[in-house]
Design a protein with these regions (language model features):
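Glycine/Thr-rich phosphate-binding loops that ligate phosphate moieties of nucleotide
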Residues: 1-125
Length: 125
């Protein structure tokens, strides 16, 4: 769980390099049903994580877009009020955030060290 979340943190850092600073994240799908994993995500990512109630968010998103396209909803904000229901929000715990920090640093260093090897493998595929 932590490894996948460290990878998510790499993505968040990439967004931040481009000037996008997410202050809150949403979780969907199977992973959004695990209270333990969502708490880990909140602590590692140091941001609130809100789990959505919908199980099939792809289908819900399609319905939202279709509803706006045919005039059923004024815009996506209005469609969101109908389709998007928040189940629970997990907030970061400062002590846990600090505890995960050295592990993430080690993960990042390992990622950077292995990256050239992965590039060689990708060239051969």
């Amino acid at each position: 769980m932590e490894g996948v979340t460290y990878e998510m943190m790499l993505n968040v850092e990439q967004l931040e390099r481009f000037g996008i600073h997410p202050t809150r994240l949403y979780a969907t799908g199977g992973g959004a049903t695990s209270d333990v994993w969502l708490k880990i995500k909140a602590d590692i990512l140091n941001r609130p994580i809100t789990a959505l109630s919908a199980k099939e968010v792809g289908a819900a998103g399609t319905c939202m877009l279709a509803g706006v396209a045919i005039g059923l909803y004024r815009d996506l904000r209005q469609a969101k009020e109908v389709f998007v229901k928040e189940r629970k929000t997990y907030t970061p715990d400062a002590e846990q955030v600090a505890a995960y920090r050295p592990y993430y640093k080690a993960y990042r260093e390992l990622y950077d060290a292995v990256r050239p090897i992965v590039e060689v493998i990708n060239e051969k595929l």
